[in-house]
């Protein structure tokens, strides 16, 4: 084990040694950079850009560019980056993660690679977790970049399209991760390329990279529209679930957070809803609503998972403790919680476009990130994002005192000890930061401190508006600050001069399921070589301890006759807690990896559709593409109607009817002409006739209008079909895990079925576009926007007359009968698709 650790450590050491040599090169350039005037320093930017056009690379420019930024930072910001910050900048430029401890100046470090990569003119995105940090960094660090002649933009949620375009056109753009993802999705829903805001994704530096790429990796960004569904079922399911008793009617597994009806519960449901079998296919919706109501009542807790604010359910981010306004749980869980809390139930939504942060950020040519805590997730960063974690040494050694955990028998004993510790430290004037996992814990400690007469600030999702002010005051003498999780991350706690010698005390009220979050809390103390102390208080009733078998420990404490006020300080327990955390982290990583495997199926499909949309938007003339679609549609129709081996069984009448109804006019293609041809020869005369009709249509209107009409039709069909496909893939995903019971790998099944559904969607797109182009009359002065919304297109009269049902030769096949082609599928899912 020690050998492995040494090996890992050595890899990091080797990287540091290598970067140290580059730092020495940068230092050696200082005497030639320092004497330059401000104008000469700014002129370096133009010089670098010219050198890039002549064939030099950004790697060649690195030492000189970093030396220029260091000198500019000293002049403009009054801050001179240390050697370790230069190392952090090199690691970022190379597309890695710089692990730099709290207070080591990550924001200043980022200016070095940001400047260097912005010289290419392709744009650099600096990504933060919230708009406050984006605005702060853009205004503070923006001065430095503007001094050097680069343009800086900030991308905010409230901005208009024109303002966003300007922000993205800048050399450097500051933005939140959410806004970047949503802009990407919106860009792929617009109808004119002038409406796009983003440029191709070149280089991004993510601040607090673990928060965005690990904690939020499973959170999909969704743009949705309304799906009209009744809210009554939620009310009924909610009323029913209120009558259930734990363990008798349902079982709840604390470890997996799984809740399900027992036999008694199922019987109760069947009686309550007057049905014979709850698991009958026709009761799928009811069962789903009952399950979601159960989850709302048993798994989801008010003030921990969500809060009720102004008559709405607002989700609480489990990692940052912030309120996530505008976000909703999917699959009807949000509506179930609304029913539980008695607020207005809002309609379920239909997904129009979706992407996860994992897949969005993997589209950048180069990606890097900074954080104080990434080493525990190194495997994930390497495997999923191809980024190495490089631990950058601190500028001054860390002298913080990290004490062993104190473990109490009950929660009550633990909280009494926490409050006593806070009171004692407060009397001595030492500033204290108390970290809690849930909002309710922070409010409980707040009440206990108020009773003791200790003034304090509370920082949780309910009052995050004052976040920066509260954090700024947290290091002054006698300050007591209670923070949920890592609210306030990204803002440093600076110590008052009169407490520099004692430092900040950090008290953790329970261990988080992720070691990383605990390390972040510890890292708030002892920044830049300051003193500090950290202490975690645990109890046998904490969720992490409950989930991973603390019964034996509790029994031992009982046997030893230990009361609530006596903690045990045991290496064994600390190790058990750490191994429990590792297990949870492993489970969470597996879940994220699995999500990525599933999401990759949709990612590949999304890339195909978005690439086609882009081509359509940029193309001047779509006629060639549309003719290709018509050819495919005709070939599919011919194959479908001539698949029998015996010629007499071919359904030529059905083929002619199909062509007359969807593509041509009555009499354009005759049965007797086609009967003389082999199937592979039939397509040619049909396509020739189609092109003839297409030419006739071209003569009826100006060319510009025809080209616009083609675009309109393609956009309308592709967007409608793609939205329906996303919805269908959602449903497939929800039901696919049930296949595991049949000894089938659900992921492989999802990939195969998803691919088949995608192919079927492409065929359907081609057919519908061909039909619209050949059969629709268009109004003059048509607007692309109007038509995409379903106006201005009318089926022509000759198309109406030809609408005869395709005839199936010989024996009629019922929609639910097995298909005659021998595929083993039902007729409606095989040869009868679309009939």
UniProtKB/Swiss-Prot annotation:
Cofactor note: May bind 1 zinc ion per subunit.
GO biological process, one term: intracellular protein transmembrane transport
Gene Ontology molecular functions: ATP binding; metal ion binding; protein-exporting ATPase activity
Pfam family, one: SecA_SW
EC number of the protein: 7.4.2.8
Cytoplasm found in the keyword field: yes
Binding site for ATP: 85, 103-107, 492
Main location: membrane
Coiled coil start-end: none
Bilayer topology term: Peripheral membrane protein
Cofactor(s) in the UniProt record: Zn(2+)
Stated role: Part of the Sec protein translocase complex. Interacts with the SecYEG preprotein conducting channel. Has a central role in coupling the hydrolysis of ATP to the transfer of proteins into and across the cell membrane, serving as an ATP-driven molecular motor driving the stepwise translocation of polypeptide chains across the membrane.
Name by which UniProt lists this protein: Protein translocase subunit SecA
């Amino acid at each position: 084990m020690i050998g492995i650790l040494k090996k890992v450590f050595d890899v990091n050491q080797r990287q540091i040694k290598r970067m140290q040599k580059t730092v020495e090169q940068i230092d050696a350039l200082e005497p030639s950079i320092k004497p330059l005037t401000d104008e000469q320093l700014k002129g370096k930017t133009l010089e670098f850009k010219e050198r890039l056009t002549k064939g030099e690379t950004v790697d060649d420019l690195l030492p000189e560019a970093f030396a220029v930024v260091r000198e500019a930072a000293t002049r403009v910001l009054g801050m001179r980056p240390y050697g370790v910050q230069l190392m952090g900048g090199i690691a970022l430029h190379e597309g890695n993660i710089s692990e730099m401890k709290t207070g080591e100046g990550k924001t200043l470090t980022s200016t070095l690679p940001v400047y260097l990569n912005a010289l290419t003119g392709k744009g650099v995105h600096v990504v933060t977790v919230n708009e406050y940090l984006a605005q702060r960094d853009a205004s503070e660090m923006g001065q430095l970049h503007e001094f050097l002649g680069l343009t800086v933009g900030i991308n905010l949620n409230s901005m208009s399209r024109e303002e966003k375009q300007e922000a993205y056109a800048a050399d450097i753009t500051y933005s939140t991760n959410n806004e970047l993802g949503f802009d990407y999705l919106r860009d792929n829903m617009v109808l004119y390329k002038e409406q796009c805001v983003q440029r191709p994704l070149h280089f991004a530096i993510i601040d607090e990279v673990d928060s965005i790429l690990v904690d939020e990796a499973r959170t999909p960004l969704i743009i949705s529209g309304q799906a009209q569904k009744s809210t009554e079922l939620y009310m009924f399911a909610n009323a029913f679930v209120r009558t259930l008793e734990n363990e008798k009617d349902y079982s709840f597994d604390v470890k997996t957070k799984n809740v399900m009806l027992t036999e008694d519960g199922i019987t109760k449901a069947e009686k309550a809803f007057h049905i014979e079998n709850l698991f009958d296919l026709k009761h799928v919706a009811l069962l789903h609503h009952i399950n979601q109501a159960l989850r709302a009542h048993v798994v989801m807790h008010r003030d921990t998972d969500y809060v009720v604010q102004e008559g709405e359910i607002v989700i609480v981010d489990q990692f940052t403790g912030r309120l996530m306004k505008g976000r909703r749980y999917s699959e009807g869980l949000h509506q179930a919680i609304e029913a539980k809390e008695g607020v207005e139930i809002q309609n379920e939504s239909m997904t129009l476009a979706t992407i996860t942060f994992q897949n969005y950020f993997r589209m950048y040519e180069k990606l890097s990130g900074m954080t104080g805590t990434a080493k525990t997730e190194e495997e994930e960063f390497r495997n999923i994002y191809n980024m190495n974690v490089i631990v950058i040494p601190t500028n001054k050694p860390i002298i913080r005192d990290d004490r062993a955990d104190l473990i109490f028998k009950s929660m009550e004993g633990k909280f009494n000890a926490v409050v006593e510790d806070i009171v004692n430290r407060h009397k001595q004037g030492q500033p204290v930061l108390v970290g809690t996992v849930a909002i309710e814990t922070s409010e409980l400690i707040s009440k206990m401190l108020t009773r003791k007469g200790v003034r304090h600030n509370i920082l949780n999702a309910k009052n995050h508006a004052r976040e920066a002010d509260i954090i700024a005051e947290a290091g002054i003498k006698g300050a007591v600050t209670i923070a949920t999780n890592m609210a306030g991350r990204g803002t440093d706690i600076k110590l008052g001069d009169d407490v520099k010698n004692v430092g900040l005390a950090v008290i953790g009220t329970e261990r988080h399921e992720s070691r990383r979050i605990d390390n972040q809390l510890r890292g708030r103390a002892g920044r830049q070589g300051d003193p500090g102390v950290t202490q975690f208080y645990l109890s046998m009733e904490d969720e992490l301890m409950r989930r991973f078998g603390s019964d034996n420990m509790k029994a031992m404490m009982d046997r030893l006759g230990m009361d609530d006020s006596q903690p045990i300080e045991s290496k064994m327990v600390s190790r058990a807690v750490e191994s429990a955390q590792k297990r949870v982290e492993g489970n969470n990583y597996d879940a994220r990896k699995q999500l990525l495997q599933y999401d990759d199926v949709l990612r590949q499909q999304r890339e195909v559709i978005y690439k086609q949309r882009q081509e359509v938007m940029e193309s001047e003339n779509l006629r060639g593409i549309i003719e290709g679609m018509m050819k495919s549609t005709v070939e599919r129709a011919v194959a479908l109607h001539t698949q029998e081996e015996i010629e007499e069984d071919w359904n030529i009448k059905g083929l002619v009817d199909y062509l007359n109804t969807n593509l041509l006019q009555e009499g354009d293609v005759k049965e007797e002409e086609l009967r003389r041809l082999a199937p592979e020869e039939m397509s040619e005369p049909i396509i020739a006739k189609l092109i003839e009709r297409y030419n006739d249509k071209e003569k009826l209107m100006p060319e510009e209008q025809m080209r616009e009409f083609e675009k309109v039709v393609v956009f309308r069909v592709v967007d409608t079909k793609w939205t329906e496909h996303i919805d269908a893939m959602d449903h497939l995903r929800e039901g696919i895990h049930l296949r595991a019971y049949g000894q089938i790998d659900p992921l492989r099944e999802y990939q195969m079925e998803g691919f088949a559904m995608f192919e079927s969607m492409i065929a359907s797109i081609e057919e519908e576009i061909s039909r619209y182009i050949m059969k629709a009359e268009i109004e003059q002065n048509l607007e692309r926007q109007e038509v995409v919304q379903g106006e201005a297109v009318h089926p022509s009269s000759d198309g109406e007359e030809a609408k005869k049902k395709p005839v199936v030769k010989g024996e009629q096949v019922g929609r639910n009968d097995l298909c005659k082609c021998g595929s083993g599928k039902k007729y409606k899912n095989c040869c009868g698709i679309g009939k």
